[in-house]
Amino acid sequence: MKNNSQLLMPREKMLKFGISALTDVELLALFLRTGTRGKDVLTLAKEMLENFGSLYGLLTSEYEQFSGVHGIGVAKFAQLKGIAELARRYYNVRMREESPLLSPEMTREFLQSQLTGEEREIFMVIFLDSQHRVITHSRLFSGTLNHVEVHPREIIREAIKINASALILAHNHPSGCAEPSKADKLITERIIKSCQFMDLRVLDHIVIGRGEYVSFAERGWI
């Protein structure tokens, strides 16, 4: 009964003020529902976040990392990974069905949802129309832990096929550091030059790391 009564606090706060009013601890407690023997759910949620550093660290962790957290078994781990996958698919559907005008923040959040946690480098492209509305997005190339082979010709071929006018490039660094490499800068220059011949504009190239990102446009490189 103690765990259930303590869970009412986040629930009541959510119903009164909205889900965004909850702290990370309260939101996690709402999901966990119950604590463990001798530990209420809010305490358990607090300890989990402290152990993993943040919600990001928690949702991108592997099962082996949960072995030191008492009260978290396979079922809860599977549920947590399910939440992360739901978020990724939500952004996927939103981008595909709403065809929104992209803000820098929405673009970053979408790309983080798609590329965070990947064990290999993935290179993807968001294709936009002349009004910078999303037409579609595609994972065009996949590579190894620290390298992905990118072919500008294939990017342009796909853009022409769907009548795109602008592109946003993106790839991840599984190592966690989002700082672009020399190779990242060189391939970006190659893609931009190739696109110019076809009247295609590259708006940005965003590199996704672990909890961080680098935007070529924000740094003035595009």
From Swiss-Prot:
CDD domains: MPN_DUF2466
Pfam families: RadC (PF04002), UPF0758_N (PF20582)
Family matches, as InterPro entries: MPN, RadC_JAB, RuvA_2-like, UPF0758, UPF0758_CS, UPF0758_N, UPF0758_YicR
Keywords annotated in UniProt: Hydrolase, Metal-binding, Metalloprotease, Protease, Zinc
One MF annotation (Gene Ontology) recorded for this entry: metallopeptidase activity
List of residues binding Zn(2+): 171, 173, 184
Keyword field contains Aminoacyl-tRNA synthetase: no
Residue positions of motif JAMM motif: 171-184
Swiss-Prot/TrEMBL GO biological process terms: proteolysis
Family: Belongs to the UPF0758 family. YicR subfamily.
Protein name stated in the entry: UPF0758 protein YicR
Gene that this polypeptide is encoded by: yicR
